[in-house]
Regions:
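Non-catalytic accessory/interaction domains
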Residues: 5-8, 12-15, 20-27, 35-175
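Catalytic-domain carbohydrate-binding cleft regions of carbohydrate-active enzymes
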Residues: 2, 29-30
């Protein structure tokens, strides 16, 4: 899962207030990594730390210790998604929960930091303006609410294979 973990680092290196993209943040982190460690024997922690240090306001930097569970904890997380539309408030709430089954030697699992690239679509497949974003699931369960919707949207989750998880989503035939 090494390549997937590095790709998640890139996704999470997006610079919050600075507005830089994940690719730009990742490139800054790579530059810092080589400045610090060129020619040295290094660890995965050194690499992750450099990416985070180059992007101090990023989702990666603010959750680095928890993100490192991808290197220490075995198994593939199962991500369960559920959506609920409230016509009265014109809002749709997405709830994501995660669970990683026990593996030999690791019966108790901590939540992973999971970037979920997503967007919302109208029933006809038209994108809902302003809905594309990366949600960061870093606990067992979290919810996000999207407002000013005229009808229940269809969620497009894990765009670009943003995380190596198994998605459980009870979608209708139309979705």
């Amino acid at each position: 899962k090494g390549a997937e973990v590095v790709r998640m680092m890139q996704t999470l290196a997006t610079g919050g207030a600075s507005g830089i993209s994940g690719r730009e943040g990742f490139a800054r982190g790579m530059k810092l990594y080589f400045e610090r460690h060129d020619g040295q024997a290094v660890t995965c922690d050194d690499f992750a730390q450099a990416i985070a240090d180059a992007n101090p306001d990023s989702a990666l930097a603010t959750r680095l210790d928890a993100f490192k569970r991808w290197y220490a904890q075995a198994g593939t997380p199962r991500l369960k998604a559920a959506g609920r539309f409230d016509a009265e408030t014109r809002s749709w709430t997405l709830t994501l929960s995660q669970h990683t089954p026990a593996t030999p030697g690791q019966t108790d699992k901590w939540p992973f930091v999971i970037p979920v690239a997503m967007g919302l679509l109208q029933a006809d497949g038209t994108p809902v303006a302003g809905s594309e974003r990366v949600l960061v699931l870093d606990s067992a369960q979290q919810s996000w609410t999207f407002d000013a919707l005229d009808a229940a949207p269809v969620a497009s989750l894990l765009r670009g294979f943003s995380a190596p998880v198994i998605l459980e989503w009870e979608a209708s035939e139309a979705e």
